[in-house]
């Protein structure tokens, strides 16, 4: 038999019954009822209802004390922030509702001088901004809050904020700032207690930066594996899945896709295999293993959110796609001295414009010795020996011209 749904009226009635003389058991019962109603609203995806709840029980916050009230508010807010709003207009509306809920709670905490609560809610807002890809606002708020936390020496919250600042900086293409923020987080984990969640977050971001800037995929894989274990140990399936996704990415970049079957068969990983994120990255890995550009492009198109909009993957998938395209072009062109652009595109399975751009880039990068005939829409490939001797012949021509000029000059001197 299902439990009777809790109503706002029942919660308000219970809150009104509490006084300074209420026993611990009575206060705890009221607190449990509030959280039960909050979870119920989260299941119903009612963020507006959760905001109403937060505002309607504020008399209870004064009754239970600052520390307990802060935890209660943060728990209720977290219920709202974990609501999946779907896609399209509903998603955009949900983002706004979540931001409004947090800013409303931050405003209340500020006006009531609940500074610890205000800072922790601001840290959560930074994470929300990153989650909804509003990296500019995330970075701005993170910079301001970091300065305050450094003065207060609130190391645990500083670690959280620094990791989020590093994430926003990375997504805004500021790797120097991303590294600096991550270094701050790492320094503070050495001198303060970091929860398993925080330590896993630091490991995850370390893996991201090592893969993006250093191209050190072995070290990145180790960091992502540590992050996976950390998130999995506390039941954080969302972040654990992301860490596993990036582990697979590292195997692709290391050209070790043949090891994926063994990795994914591991006891602690099997439960994550059916996640859309893992299915997406595996489709990319399969295409790369088969060296099929067509399948690779198809994977990117079918899993755009996971493989293109995720910058951690996109940084590498774009390079992989470019390299695979150039190899395909070289393979098709190799037997010919002149070949139509339309034929190359047809064999590769792409349209002409991206193929033409890729060939132009290859010529500029000296990966292909040839030229594009714009009138005939063909690619003229120079013979390899001829291409190798072009520079030598050019120097010889210049030397001959120099001799001619010198002779002409010396002859004119005799006429004077």
From Swiss-Prot:
Matching Pfam families: PCI, RPN6_N
One cellular component term from this protein's GO annotations in UniProt: proteasome regulatory particle, lid subcomplex
Keyword NADP among UniProt keywords: no
Amino-acid biosynthesis in keyword set: no
Coiled-coil stretches: none
GO molecular function, one term: structural molecule activity
Domain PCI: start-end pairs: 217-386
Positions of transmembrane segments: none
Keywords, sorted A to Z: Proteasome
GO BP terms, alphabetized: ubiquitin-dependent protein catabolic process
InterPro entries: 26S_Proteasome/COP9_Components, PCI_dom, Rpn6_N, WH_DNA-bd_sf
Family, per entry: Belongs to the proteasome subunit S9 family.
Binding partners and assembly: Component of the lid subcomplex of the 19S proteasome regulatory particle complex (also named PA700 complex). The 26S proteasome consists of a 20S proteasome core and two 19S regulatory subunits.
Function: Component of the lid subcomplex of the 26S proteasome, a multiprotein complex involved in the ATP-dependent degradation of ubiquitinated proteins. In the complex, rpn-6.2 is required for proteasome assembly.
Record's protein name: Probable 26S proteasome regulatory subunit rpn-6.2
Organism whose genome encodes this protein: Caenorhabditis elegans
Designated gene of the protein: rpn-6.2
């Amino acid at each position: 038999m299902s439990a009777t749904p809790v109503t706002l009226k029942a919660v308000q009635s219970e809150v009104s019954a509490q006084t300074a003389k209420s026993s611990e058991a009575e206060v705890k019962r009221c607190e449990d009822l509030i959280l039960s109603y909050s979870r119920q609203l989260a299941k119903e995806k009612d963020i507006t209802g959760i905001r109403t709840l937060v505002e309607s029980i504020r008399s209870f916050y004064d009754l239970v004390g600052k520390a307990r009230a802060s935890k209660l508010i943060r728990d209720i807010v977290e219920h709202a922030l974990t609501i999946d709003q779907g896609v399209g207009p509903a998603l955009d509306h949900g983002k706004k509702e979540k931001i409004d809920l947090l800013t409303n709670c931050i405003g209340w905490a500020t006006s009531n001088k609940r500074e610890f609560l205000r800072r922790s809610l601001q840290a959560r807002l930074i994470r929300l901004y990153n989650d909804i890809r509003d990296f500019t606002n995330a970075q701005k708020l993170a910079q301001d809050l970091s300065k305050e936390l450094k003065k207060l020496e609130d190391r645990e919250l500083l670690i959280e904020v620094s990791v989020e600042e590093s994430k926003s900086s990375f997504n805004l293409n500021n790797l120097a700032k991303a590294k600096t923020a991550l270094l701050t987080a790492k320094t503070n984990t050495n001198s303060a207690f970091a929860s398993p969640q925080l330590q896993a977050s630091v490991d995850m971001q370390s893996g991201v930066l090592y893969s993006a800037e250093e191209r050190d995929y072995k070290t990145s894989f180790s960091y992502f594996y540590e992050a996976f274990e950390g998130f999995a140990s506390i039941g954080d399936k969302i972040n654990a899945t992301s860490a596993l996704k990036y582990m697979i990415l590292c195997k692709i970049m290391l050209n070790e896709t043949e090891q994926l079957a063994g990795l994914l068969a591991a006891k602690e990983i099997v439960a994550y295999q059916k996640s859309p994120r893992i299915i997406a990255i595996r489709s990319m890995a399969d295409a790369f293993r088969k060296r099929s550009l067509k399948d690779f492009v198809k994977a990117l198109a079918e899993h755009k959110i996971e493989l293109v909009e995720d910058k951690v993957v996109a940084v590498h998938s774009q390079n992989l796609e470019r390299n695979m395209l150039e190899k395909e072009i070289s393979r098709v062109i190799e037997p010919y001295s002149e070949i139509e652009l339309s034929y190359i595109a047809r064999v590769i399975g792409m349209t002409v414009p991206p193929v033409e751009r890729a060939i132009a880039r290859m010529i500029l990068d000296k990966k292909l010795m040839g030229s594009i005939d714009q009138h005939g829409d063909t690619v003229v490939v120079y013979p390899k020996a001829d291409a190798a001797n072009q520079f030598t012949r050019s120097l010889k021509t210049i030397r001959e011209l120099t001799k001619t000029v010198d002779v002409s000059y010396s002859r004119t001197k005799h006429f004077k």
